[in-house]
Amino acid sequence: MGAYRYMQELWRKKQSDVMRFLLRVRCWQYRQLSNLHRAPRPTRPDKARRLGYKAKQGYVIYRVRVRRGGRKRPVPKGATYGKPVHHGVNQIKFARSLQSVAEERAGRHCGALRVLNSYWVGEDSTYKFFEVILIDPFHKAIRRNPDTQWITKAVHKHREMRGLTSAGKKSRGLGKGHKFHLTIGGSRRAAWKRRNTLQLHRYR
């Protein structure tokens, strides 16, 4: 087994004494920093490499802190107007994961970079911490490499805003396996529409 395999096993056993201590100390460290800052290197090099990171020019890691919990509807003094069924303010659940929110914030902050992927690095009772892998699409090392040329195309601008990253696709219900059967046909809406449309085929 290589070194990354051992690191992967360490991260799998998060309840071990070593990992509990490490995660607790790191969470304290991350809380002292700003909610979005550049990391000098990935905290989990094995995970980052599996998601496409390379230790070369053009790759950047940003660490993002996201507040945990449900979403409160931003309305003044709870005045929502309309019918009582839509009066909810406090117990609102956001449709996307906190990981996709972290990707979006990093993408907004670094508008010229492209979000490749992200991964979890820690959490406490109040916050979750994610590291986001970003790529500079104008760097020669990225543009000349056939493996990374795809992300330099204009169609991949702000892919994190449109649910095209791994975390975004999961929130949209897109994927393989029995967990994603509600989106056969492209999206949740397309699948629902097909199932609820009565088709009376003509007898010939």
Swiss-Prot record:
GO BP: cytoplasmic translation
Molecular function GO terms recorded: RNA binding; structural constituent of ribosome
Compartments, record wording: Cytoplasm
Keywords: Cytoplasm, Ribonucleoprotein, Ribosomal protein
GO cellular component: cytosolic large ribosomal subunit
Cysteines engaged in disulfide bonds, as pairs: none
UniProt xrefs under InterPro entries: Rbsml_eL15_core_dom_sf (IPR024794), Ribosomal_eL15 (IPR000439), Ribosomal_eL15_CS (IPR020925), Ribosomal_uL23/eL15/eS24_sf (IPR012678)
PROSITE patterns recorded: RIBOSOMAL_L15E
Subunit note: Component of the large ribosomal subunit.
Family: Belongs to the eukaryotic ribosomal protein eL15 family.
Annotated function: Component of the large ribosomal subunit. The ribosome is a large ribonucleoprotein complex responsible for the synthesis of proteins in the cell.
Entry protein name: Large ribosomal subunit protein eL15
